[in-house]
Regions:
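Extended active-site neighborhood of metal-dependent phosphoesterases/phosphodiesterases
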Residues: 14, 77-190, 284-290
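N-terminal active-site segment of His-dependent metallophosphoesterases
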Residues: 12-78
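Acidic/polar, compositionally biased interaction segments
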Residues: 323-472
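Active-site environment of divalent metal-dependent phosphoester hydrolases
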Residues: 35-37, 68-73, 92-103, 157-160, ...
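Structural recognition of the beta-strand scaffold that forms the well-ordered cores
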Residues: 25-29, 58-63, 68, 89-94, ...
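His/acidic metal-ligating clusters that form di-metal
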Residues: 56-58, 148-151, 163-255
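Hydrophobic h-region of N-terminal signal peptides that target proteins for export
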Residues: 4-12
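Binuclear metal-dependent phosphoesterase catalytic core
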Residues: 20, 29, 133-137, 143, ...
């Protein structure tokens, strides 16, 4: 009986990765820093097994600096044993310290012997080891790939110190990724498949997130310790349009995440007891949605779950705690937007009221195309917006020149001042129903534009005519 159960477990591990009931969950463990001689291994193993027990994922991905002391071979056997005991399929990407104790080829020779390891050595003709892509198949169509996981070696150190401290993802690796992406896209009728990427060292673009109000989590390192050379991996992710999120480790005192060019750049949570840093040890969970460019992610430790971040909206479970603006007690009958049109030379939206009031009227939306003047004019738009469901919403106002958006009298977006085309966002928690919306806009000279977009957990659209109603 025991043998039959063992064989059944191994057979299940060798099945293709597949969505279940429309979801696929994985846990990223990073910077385990396993030292076979250390008593800290017991705590590290407890962390891994506790997170697996809490989350019960479909896959674990280890993103580098896994075994970082001798005897390394025994250390890797211990790591493999943990996941085999848990009957958990797992994958591995290399960190900059892993090959200091055992060469990468030998590491992968050992890994592929485990029936629970789903990765591979990767192509020999490109830089690094373990570059591969994992297809995740749909829950209903057994032969249809629904999503992709790219596992990439971010390499170790450059050939000379004048190139910086850390190596980078090389051109032939990027070319390999682009070929894989192109082929999977072609096989999906020309539509890029939703994908994630996992490796060890952060891309230089992670630095763009530091200090932004839309970035969540901690940057206790004070920086993203990336390569000095930017080889263009991120630009290829943008160009190929499949990767939704990138997940790395390396910087133990960072666990922040945010979006750059509509791609999430995220750190995992340091896992190993013997790694430096004060964070509670744990793992980052990522849950994909079948057939959608959507995922949720959060950190889980033996002490429990931390806040969740929802892609693509950028909304978090902290946002959802409120407070929420209550809906107006109105039942408007007519759709539309009331406006007052002004002319004059303005530097701020507030300057409009000192200008010449030319006319008033009703439009179907926030539309400036019917302005009588080409330059030097402004609009005061007023409407009731129908919010379909209670939730947190981002409002994006793209304007040339200035604009301000208010909901229920509260300033949500400040894109004021004379400037070229620029997009500014703001967020607000709203009860379902009607809310007063006021949009101020002015045009100075040389180009005019105004667009308003609303993004919620299940909404991403330009505000449409059927959402707007005339105030009573």
């Amino acid at each position: 009986m025991v043998l039959l159960l063992l064989c059944a477990g191994i057979a299940s591990a060798r099945q293709p990765l597949r969505f279940k009931d429309g979801k696929f969950k994985m846990v990223q463990f990073t910077d385990i820093h396993w030292d076979p001689k250390s008593a800290g291994c017991e705590a590290t193993e407890h962390t891994i097994k506790s997170v697996l027990e809490i989350e019960k994922p479909d896959l674990a991905i280890l993103t580098g600096d896994i075994v970082t002391s001798d005897p390394a071979l025994e250390g890797w056997k211990s790591i493999i044993r943990i996941f085999e005991e848990e009957k958990m399929r797992f994958d591995v990407t290399m960190g900059n310290h892993d090959a200091e104790y055992l060469d990468k080829q030998t590491i992968y020779d050992l890994l592929v012997k485990s029936p629970y390891f789903v990765g591979s050595h990767g192509p020999k003709e490109i830089k690094g080891c373990g570059n591969h892509v994992l297809p995740i198949y749909g829950s209903k169509q057994s032969d249809k790939v629904a999503s992709l996981l790219y596992c990439i070696d971010s390499n170790d150190y450059p050939e000379t110190e004048d190139l910086g401290h850390y190596d980078w993802i090389h051109f032939n690796q990027i070319e390999w990724y682009r070929d894989q992406s192109k082929n999977f896209t072609a096989g999906n009728g020309g539509e890029p498949l939703p994908a994630l990427a996992f490796f060890h060292i952060a891309l230089p673009e992670y630095r763009h997130l530091i200090g932004k109000k839309t970035t969540w989590g901690r940057c206790d390192e004070g920086d993203a310790c990336a390569a000095d050379v930017n080889s263009g991996m991120f630009a290829s992710f943008v160009d190929c349009k499949d990767v939704m999120g990138v997940f790395v480790g390396h910087d133990h005192d960072n666990d922040f995440l945010g979006q750059e060019k509509n791609i999430v750049l995220a750190y995992g949570r340091v896992t190993g007891k013997d790694a430096y840093g004060e964070f509670i040890r744990g793992g980052r969970v990522v849950e994909l949605y079948e057939g959608k460019r959507q995922f949720d992610t959060w950190i889980t430790t033996p002490e429990g779950k931390e806040f969740a971040y929802y892609y693509p909206s950028g909304i978090t479970s902290i946002d959802e705690e409120g407070p929420y603006l209550p809906a107006q007690k109105v039942q408007p009958k007519k759709q539309g937007v009331a406006y007052t049109y002004y002319e004059g030379e303005f530097e701020q939206t507030a300057d409009m009221y000192a200008g010449k009031k030319v006319k008033e009227g009703v439009l179907s939306n926030f539309n400036i195309s019917e302005a009588p003047a080409k330059d030097y004019f402004g609009y005061d738009f007023r409407s009731l917006i129908r919010i379909p469901e209670k939730g947190v919403y981002y409002f994006y106002v793209s304007s040339d020149d200035g604009a301000k958006l208010f909901i229920d009298g509260k300033e949500i977006v400040d894109n004021d001042g004379s400037h070229s085309l620029k997009c500014v966002e703001g967020k607000v928690a709203l009860e379902a129903g009607f809310h007063e919306v006021k949009l101020l806009y002015f045009e100075s000279y040389m180009g005019e534009s105004l667009k308003v977009r609303m993004v919620g957990r299940s909404t991403d659209k330009l505000i449409s005519d059927d959402m707007l109603f005339l105030p009573e």
